Amino acid sequence: MTQINCTQVTEFILVGLTDRQELKMPLFVLFLSIYLFTVVGNLGLILLIRTDEKLNTPMYFFLSNLAFVDFCYSSVITPKMLGNFLYKQNSISFNACAAQLGCFLAFMTAECLLLASMAYDRYVAICNPLMYMVVMSPGICIQLVAAPHSYSILVALFHTILTFRLSYCHSNIVNHFYCDDMPLLRLTCSDTRFKQLWIFACAGIMFISSLLIVFVSYMFIISAILRMHSAEGRQKAFSTCGSHMLAVTIFYGTLIFMYLQPSSSHALDTDKMASVFYTVIIPMLNPLIYSLQNKEVKEALKKIIINKN
C-alpha cells in the first residue's frame, strides 16, 4: 500500500444521525428507550433460559448465545450514539474508534454465523427428530457456537488492523454515527485496493456460506414438513422454525439491502438508516420474535411471574 506523508489524525469526529438540534433530544429519548428494552429483553431471555430446566435444550442454548451477541452488538454502538445526541462535538479517539469497529465486526460476523448454526439445529430437529439429542450433543453445540465466535474474532482483528494501518489525513470527520468501514475508507490518503479486495472476499465468503447453510437447511425442513400427514405436526414444525425464519429474513434482508445495492445508488443517509436498523432495531426485535411465538418461553415467563406473586 502506498503511503502519503501527512499528519496522522489522533481522533475522529462523528457526524451522527442529524445535525438539527431540535431533533437530538427526542431521538435521545427514543434510542435510550430502545436500548433499555434491548438490554432487558436479551439479558432477561438469557436468565430465563438458564434458570428453567425445560429450556435446557440445544435450541435454547443457541438462542441464549444469540441474545448475548445481540446485547453486546447493541452495546458497542448505542451508548456512543446516545452520547452524540448530548454533546456538540462528537469526538472519538483513534484507538476507541478502532476498538468500536473491531467489536462491531466481531459481533456482526458472530450473529451471521450463529443464525446458520441455528438453522442447522432446526434442520436436525425437524428432519431427524429421533436422533436429535444424539446429533446435537453438548460437545457439538459448543463447537457450533465456538466456531462462529473464533472466526469472527480473527476476521475482525485482521480487518481492523488493515483499516487502521492506513493513513488518515484528508479529514477526520466521519459521516456516520459510529466507526464503520466504508465512511473511514473515504477519509484515507492510502491505497485502499487491497483493503477493499479483502472486504469483498471475506464478506462474500462469510455471507454466501452462511446464507447457503440457512437456505439448504430450510429447503430440507420445508420438504419434510410438506411430507407430514398430520396437520397438527405441520403446525408444530412451522411454529418451531417460524421465529428463526423471521429473524433470518430480517437480518439477511437488511445486510443485502445495505451491502449489495449498486454503488451508484449508495447514499450515506440510506446507509445510516439501514445501519440503525441492524445495529439498534434488530437486537431489540429478536427477543420479541423468539419469545412471543414460543410457547415454552411464554410458559417459563408465566411461571416466574406466578412464583413472584
Swiss-Prot record:
InterPro entries: GPCR_Rhodpsn (IPR000276), GPCR_Rhodpsn_7TM (IPR017452), Olfact_rcpt (IPR000725). Disulfide bonds join 97-179. Glycans are attached at residue 5. It holds the Pfam family 7tm_4. The chain crosses the membrane at residues 29-49, 57-77, 98-118, 144-164, 205-225, 240-260, 273-293. GO terms for cellular component: plasma membrane. Residues 50-56, 119-143, 226-239, 294-309 are cytoplasmic. Residues 1-28, 78-97, 165-204, 261-272 are extracellular. Its main location: membrane. Belongs to the G-protein coupled receptor 1 family. This is Olfactory receptor 8U9. The lineage of its organism: Eukaryota, Metazoa, Chordata, Craniata, Vertebrata.
